[in-house]
């Protein structure tokens, strides 16, 4: 899964909001609480 995280981080650096994608991916591991109103940029700190 790490390669996916790196890819999302690269896209995030380009200013793309992946909130919906992050919810579908990360909610399965950490639950919806960590994903609400956040971008993948915020979530990479958790990863």
Swiss-Prot record:
Gene Ontology annotations of biological process type: DNA integration
Domain of life: Bacteria
GO molecular function, one term: DNA strand exchange activity
Cytoplasm as UniProt keyword: no
Limits of the Resolvase/invertase-type recombinase catalytic domain: 1-47
Keywords per UniProt: DNA integration, DNA invertase, DNA recombination, DNA-binding
Entry's family note: Belongs to the site-specific recombinase resolvase family.
Name of protein: Putative protein PinH
Organism in which the protein naturally occurs: Escherichia coli (strain K12)
UniProt lineage: Bacteria, Pseudomonadati, Pseudomonadota, Gammaproteobacteria, Enterobacterales
